[in-house]
Amino acid sequence: MPRIYKIVGDTTTGMKFRIEVVAEKPYDAIEKAYSLIGSRHKLSRMQIRIREVVPISPEEARSEHVKILMAVDKIYKY
């Protein structure tokens, strides 16, 4: 069952980030964070430092997108 993970970190450019992702395992959440931050800000993995990965409840989530994903039972792709 997927869980919501809060990922906190910073980059070598001085930017701090807090991101919420839905993933099965903490490792998958870290990979998703590397992908999202890297693509949004054109950074490599070596430039991204992840400080904390914590599972959170759906009530604690700030992102509406994450809340909607957790509320859906099944996703169909056509």
Swiss-Prot record:
<comment type="similarity">
    <text>Belongs to the eukaryotic ribosomal protein eL20 family.</text>
</comment>
<dbReference type="GO" id="GO:0070180">
    <property type="term" value="F:large ribosomal subunit rRNA binding"/>
</dbReference>
<keyword id="KW-0687">Ribonucleoprotein</keyword>
<protein>
    <recommendedName>
        <fullName>Large ribosomal subunit protein eL20</fullName>
    </recommendedName>
</protein>
<dbReference type="InterPro" id="IPR023573">
    <property type="entry name" value="Ribosomal_eL20_dom"/>
</dbReference>
<keyword id="KW-0694">RNA-binding</keyword>
<dbReference type="GO" id="GO:0006412">
    <property type="term" value="P:translation"/>
</dbReference>
<dbReference type="GO" id="GO:0005840">
    <property type="term" value="C:ribosome"/>
</dbReference>
<keyword id="KW-0689">Ribosomal protein</keyword>
<keyword id="KW-0699">rRNA-binding</keyword>
<dbReference type="GO" id="GO:1990904">
    <property type="term" value="C:ribonucleoprotein complex"/>
</dbReference>
<comment type="subunit">
    <text>Part of the 50S ribosomal subunit. Binds 23S rRNA.</text>
</comment>
<dbReference type="InterPro" id="IPR028877">
    <property type="entry name" value="Ribosomal_eL20"/>
</dbReference>
<dbReference type="Pfam" id="PF01775">
    <property type="entry name" value="Ribosomal_L18A"/>
</dbReference>
<dbReference type="GO" id="GO:0003735">
    <property type="term" value="F:structural constituent of ribosome"/>
</dbReference>
